[in-house]
């Protein structure tokens, strides 16, 4: 069989279609799924696509997760989901001056950071997420203190 040559937009649309219909837990599974459709991709390409599409990993039980599109419509939806994620997956929040570090369960930092970004708060300059750590830059030291209190409250529910 001949592999299909897709544009980036076509490939990303195909990824969205797959994760909307199927439970895909890892980048490797997504690579295999695309290859089953004769779409040749590398895991590095899939990693970039996941970031650009702002996919999040949602828990599906028994320690497993699946990729999903973050489909928050309103500010309240984002706040509710952020609270749920903080209660379930955030382990620690620490602060130094106007910077905060949020430690999460493996694989959940990106989803939490995405929701923080979607709030578009004036007191948050920006976020940077890895696998289990989020770096949050607050506008001022005072705002960082306030954010830390707010994040601790979210952790407690």
UniProtKB/Swiss-Prot annotation:
Compartment annotation: Cytoplasm
Database matches in Pfam families: Arg_repressor, Arg_repressor_C
GO CC annotation: cytoplasm
InterPro entries: Arg_repress (IPR001669), Arg_repress_C (IPR020899), Arg_repress_C_sf (IPR036251), Arg_repress_DNA-bd (IPR020900), WH-like_DNA-bd_sf (IPR036388), WH_DNA-bd_sf (IPR036390)
GO biological process, one term: L-arginine biosynthetic process
Metabolic or biological pathway: Amino-acid biosynthesis; L-arginine biosynthesis [regulation]
Keyword entries, A-Z: Amino-acid biosynthesis, Arginine biosynthesis, Cytoplasm, DNA-binding, Repressor, Transcription, Transcription regulation
Role summary: Regulates arginine biosynthesis genes.
Matches recorded under PANTHER family: ARGININE REPRESSOR
Family (UniProt): Belongs to the ArgR family.
Protein name listed in UniProt: Arginine repressor
Species the sequence originates in: Deinococcus deserti (strain DSM 17065 / CIP 109153 / LMG 22923 / VCD115)
């Amino acid at each position: 069989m001949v592999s299909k040559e897709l544009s980036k937009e076509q490939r990303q649309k195909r990824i969205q279609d797959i994760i909307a219909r199927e439970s895909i837990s890892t980048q490797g599974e997504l690579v295999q799924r695309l290859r089953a459709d004769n779409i040749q991709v590398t895991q590095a390409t899939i990693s970039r696509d996941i970031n650009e599409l702002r996919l999040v990993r949602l828990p599906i039980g028994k320690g497993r997760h699946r990729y999903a599109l973050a489909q928050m419509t309103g500010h309240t939806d984002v706040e509710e989901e952020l609270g749920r994620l903080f209660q379930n997956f955030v382990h620690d929040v620490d602060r130094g001056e106007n910077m905060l570090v949020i430690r999460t369960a493996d694989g959940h930092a990106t989803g939490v950071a995405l929701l923080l970004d979607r709030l578009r708060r004036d007191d948050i300059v920006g976020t940077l997420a890895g696998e289990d750590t989020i770096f949050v830059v607050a506008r001022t030291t005072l705002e960082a203190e306030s954010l830390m209190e707010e994040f601790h409250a979210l952790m407690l529910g």
